[in-house]
């Protein structure tokens, strides 16, 4: 059978209807999720993805790029399969878009063995059930809501509380500490942040463009002729972007494109030994939002708060693929924008059901000047269990939560009557809780250029020791500011002694 050619019959925003001529007997319409190609007048190609079969000869598709300039009657060519992503060592250190084209201005990528972005989750017998902790070097996370290898972690927070900075620090720490490989999917976020992330990664050595390029970048140039491709393949991250300015089709699919890249690296572990892959999605809310934008145009009835009726299905299909197999693990960290700080909104609420750990960022904590602004009482982890993390770790974490909870309860009394009305025992609790609260902060490597303070990665043993000393009252004599933005307890003691000396002068 010769290849059938379609023609555009209707364009409504990002949704394109394609009509295929032919009799019923010889006409085989492209399958759902197949990619079709439209050649624009300027020679560039536009990929559209089949979403529905409507009528007898028409398919309804969603465009992966702007539909500006399309006209009725333009030819449409089926590609014979779904959108695919390139795989292998060649994609290390590279930037790609939703359809797997390179967007970093460097050489084109080879499509041999490319993976389809619509894949089935691993079979049950291929899964692994071993529980292991992934230590990040960030005190508040490692102590109170430890991440599990192969788990799903949600970063919840409103606008501007530090989700992206925390993700950048995690990428930096995992690359340095675990020699792990990271895949970053930028889903509907700011293009500027993507640019900053790439520069940050080149500076920290997570992505390598070679010394010659790095020197020219530091002088303010961006000269791709100086890129050393042998160095690029030693990079420890790949970036996939579908940013805010992209149409909703691209934003809804780019999370799947990034996940496909992460799966390809995990599956390479079958040859090279088990691999730990970190998969970052910034922001999973935009995945839902893009789905709701397209949903109405596809003629679906909206459900609660205007979201698509298939919200739970789309989310489940993606989340089920993020898992550990015998060839390696994919640990995913998903930033979740919370609309109007409302955790009961269907988008964050649907995401919650899939998560193993939640890190909730709070505006109240940013107002205290404590960064990362993680809310220790709202954040949770399924693996904070003495059988997994050890008895001492578990006990210290519970004591930290108890003292912070008691402090929260006493705040109402303090705000009305003042500290003087508290009993001596309660006053001691408040003073220690304030030290604990400040010690949960720490300087970040990726924020060093803004703060001027070198970043700290703290081992879990040092974290447990530090909080135990505060809870046991061994450092009650030190002023509260000593505990703010330090790594280990030794740094806090040194800082506290300097503050005491200055106060006594």
Curated annotation (Swiss-Prot):
GO molecular function annotations of the record: ATP binding; ATP hydrolysis activity; proton-transporting ATP synthase activity, rotational mechanism
Topology relative to the membrane: Peripheral membrane protein
Catalyzed reaction equations: ATP + H2O + 4 H(+)(in) = ADP + phosphate + 5 H(+)(out)
PROSITE patterns with a match to the protein in the record: ATPASE_ALPHA_BETA
Binding site for ATP: 157-164
InterPro entries reported for this sequence: AAA+_ATPase, ATP-synt_VA_C, ATP_synth_F1_bsu, ATPase_a/bsu_AS, ATPase_alpha/beta_chains, ATPase_F1/V1/A1_a/bsu_N, ATPase_F1/V1/A1_a/bsu_N_sf, ATPase_F1/V1/A1_a/bsu_nucl-bd
Annotated GO CC locations: plasma membrane; proton-transporting ATP synthase complex
Keywords for the protein's UniProt record, in alphabetical order: ATP synthesis, ATP-binding, Cell inner membrane, Cell membrane, CF(1), Hydrogen ion transport, Ion transport, Membrane, Nucleotide-binding, Translocase, Transport
Subcellular location field: Cell inner membrane
Domain of life: Bacteria
Record's function text: Produces ATP from ADP in the presence of a proton gradient across the membrane. The catalytic sites are hosted primarily by the beta subunits.
Description of how the protein assembles with itself and partners: F-type ATPases have 2 components, CF(1) - the catalytic core - and CF(0) - the membrane proton channel. CF(1) has five subunits: alpha(3), beta(3), gamma(1), delta(1), epsilon(1). CF(0) has three main subunits: a(1), b(2) and c(9-12). The alpha and beta chains form an alternating ring which encloses part of the gamma chain. CF(1) is attached to CF(0) by a central stalk formed by the gamma and epsilon chains, while a peripheral stalk is formed by the delta and b chains.
Name recorded for this polypeptide: ATP synthase subunit beta
């Amino acid at each position: 059978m010769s290849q059938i050619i379609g023609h555009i019959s209707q364009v409504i925003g990002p949704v394109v209807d394609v009509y295929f001529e032919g009799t019923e007997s010889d006409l085989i319409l492209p399958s759902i999720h197949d990619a079709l190609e439209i050649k624009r007048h300027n020679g560039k190609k536009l990929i559209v993805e089949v979403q529905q079969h409507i009528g007898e000869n028409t398919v309804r598709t969603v465009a992966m790029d702007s539909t500006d300039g399309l006209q009725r009657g333009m030819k449409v060519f089926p590609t014979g399969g779904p959108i695919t992503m390139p795989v292998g060592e060649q994609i290390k250190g590279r930037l790609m878009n939703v359809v797997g084209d390179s967007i970093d201005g460097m050489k084109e990528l080879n499509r041999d063995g490319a993976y389809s972005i619509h894949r089935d989750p691993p079979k049950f017998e291929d899964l692994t059930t071993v529980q292991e902790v992934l230590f990040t070097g960030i005190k508040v996370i490692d102590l109170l809501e430890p991440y599990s290898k192969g788990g799903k972690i949600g970063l919840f927070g409103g606008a501007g509380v530090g989700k992206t900075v925390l993700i950048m620090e995690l990428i930096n720490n995992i690359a340095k500490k675990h020699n792990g490989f990271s895949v970053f999917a930028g889903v509907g976020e700011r293009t500027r942040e993507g640019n900053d992330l790439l520069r940050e990664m080149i500076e920290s050595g997570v992505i390598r463009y070679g010394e010659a390029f790095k020197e020219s970048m530091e002088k303010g140039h961006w000269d791709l002729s100086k890129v050393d491709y042998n160095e690029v393949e030693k990079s420890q991250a790949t970036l996939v972007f579908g940013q805010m300015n992209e149409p909703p089709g691209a934003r809804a699919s780019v999370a799947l494109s990034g996940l496909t890249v992460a799966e390809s690296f995990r599956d390479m572990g079958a040859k090279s030994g088990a691999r730990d892959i970190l998969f970052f999605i910034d922001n999973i809310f935009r995945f839902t939002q893009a789905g709701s934008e397209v949903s109405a145009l596809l003629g679906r009835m909206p459900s609660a708060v205007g979201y698509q009726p298939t919200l739970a299905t789309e989310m489940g299909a993606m989340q089920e693929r993020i898992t550990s197999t015998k060839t390696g693990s994919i640990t995913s960290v998903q930033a979740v924008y919370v609309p109007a700080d409302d955790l009961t909104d269907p988008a964050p609420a649907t995401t919650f059901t899939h998560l193993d750990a939640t890190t909730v960022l709070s505006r109240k904590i940013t107002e205290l000047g404590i960064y990362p602004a993680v809310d220790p009482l709202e954040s949770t982890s399924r693996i904070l269990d003495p059988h997994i993390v050890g008895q001492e770790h578990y006990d210290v974490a519970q004591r930290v939560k108890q003292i912070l909870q008691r402090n929260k309860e006493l705040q109402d009394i303090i705000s009305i009557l003042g500290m003087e009305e508290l009993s001596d025992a309660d006053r001691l609790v408040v003073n220690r809780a304030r030290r604990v609260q400040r010690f949960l902060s720490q300087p970040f490597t990726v924020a060093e250029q803004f703060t001027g303070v070198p970043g700290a990665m703290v081992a879990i043993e040092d974290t447990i020791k530090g909080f135990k000393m505060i809870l046991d009252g061994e450092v009650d004599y030190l002023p509260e500011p000593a505990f703010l933005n330090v790594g280990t307890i030794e740094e806090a003691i040194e800082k506290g002694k300097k503050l005491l000396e200055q106060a006594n002068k």
